[in-house]
Structures are given as structure tokens and as C-alpha cells.
A protein has these predicted regions:
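Extended two-metal-dependent nuclease catalytic cores across DNA- and RNA-processing enzymes
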Residues: 1-143
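Charged, low-complexity intrinsically disordered segments
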Residues: 145-151
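Long, highly charged low-complexity segments enriched in Glu/Asp and Lys/Arg with interspersed Ser/Thr
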Residues: 153-155
Length: 155
């Protein structure tokens, strides 16, 4: 939440560039102009310029993909029966997770469509959990953050 707040308010804090150092791909939700994530595990950096080397969706579509497929590491359930390929197809057809939610019930007899129609209420809940930027100030209390510049004395 603190990283999301700094990304959201980078102009306010006069931050030219933000490197997020983490192996957690959730932080890729924060990648934008002048914000990248470096994985200390893979030794690779994710930027807007090389985004397509890492993902089959746009940065804007990434949150929708995560809303539909979930995130086991963060205990965010996806829609049963919907993996990345099916999620990508739905995103391409409807635009984003919220538009999919708005179109429920979806027509079709496939099991994953039936599952989506039965579990669609999970979409806005997942969106709120995954949307780091929108909800970061509520989570940390924006008034509790300050940026200290200069050399810090270790003593």
C-alpha cells in the first residue's frame, strides 16, 4: 500500500523514477511511465517498454486478468474454471472485468460460462483487492506518509 501511494503521488513527492524491487508480480499493477519493477529472483525488470515480453495483456488489462483468475498467493479466489487463456478471451470480447460483470448473465453452455454466471459477484470484490492505486490511501492513511530526502546518519 505504501508503494502504491508513492506511485500515485510521485509528482507530489517530486520522484522522477520509482523502481519497485520485488519478485511479487502483483506489483506489476503499479508499472507505468517512470515506474518499473525489478525482480531480484529473475534479475529482470518489467517496464512499459518491455511489458509485452512478460504478458499477453496490456497493463490496463492486467488487473482484469487477475480479477478473473485470482491470486492463490494472496488468497484471492478466481472464477472457477477460468484460467489465463479463457480470461484473456473474455477480456478481448468485453473489454475488462467490470464490463464482463455488467454483461452477466453471459450466454453459453460452457462450464466456465456457467461458473462465471454463478460466481460473478467475486469480480468487484477481487477488483477492490487488486486495485492497489485506488484504495491505497484508505489502507494506510495518506496523512501518515512523508518522504525524507538527504543522507541519513546511521548512528
Amino acid at each position: 500500500d505504501i508503494a502504491a501511494h508513492l506511485v500515485k503521488e510521485k509528482e507530489k513527492y517530486d520522484l522522477e523514477y520509482i523502481w519497485l524491487i520485488s519478485s511479487d508480480k502483483d506489483w506489476d499493477l503499479l508499472v507505468q511511465n517512470n515506474v518499473s519493477r525489478f525482480s531480484y529472483v529473475t534479475r529482470k525488470e518489467v517496464t512499459l517498454e518491455n511489458w509485452n515480453d512478460h504478458y499477453d495483456v496490456t497493463p490496463e488489462e492486467y488487473i482484469s486478468l487477475k480479477c478473473l483468475t485470482g491470486d492463490k498467493g494472496d488468497n484471492v479466489p478466481g472464477i472457477p474454471g477460468i484460467g489465463p487463456k479463457r480470461a484473456l478471451g473474455l477480456i478481448k470480447e468485453y473489454g475488462d472485468a467490470i464490463s464482463i460483470y455488467d454483461h452477466v448473465p453471459l450466454p453459453g453452455k460452457y462450464k466456465y460460462i456457467e461458473s462465471l454466471n454463478e460466481n460473478y459477484e467475486q469480480i468487484p470484490q477481487n477488483y477492490e483487492l487488486m486495485d492497489l492505486i485506488t484504495y491505497c490511501d484508505d489502507a494506510i492513511g495518506a496523512d501518515n506518509i512523508s518522504v525524507i530526502r538527504g543522507i541519513m546518519d546511521a548512528a
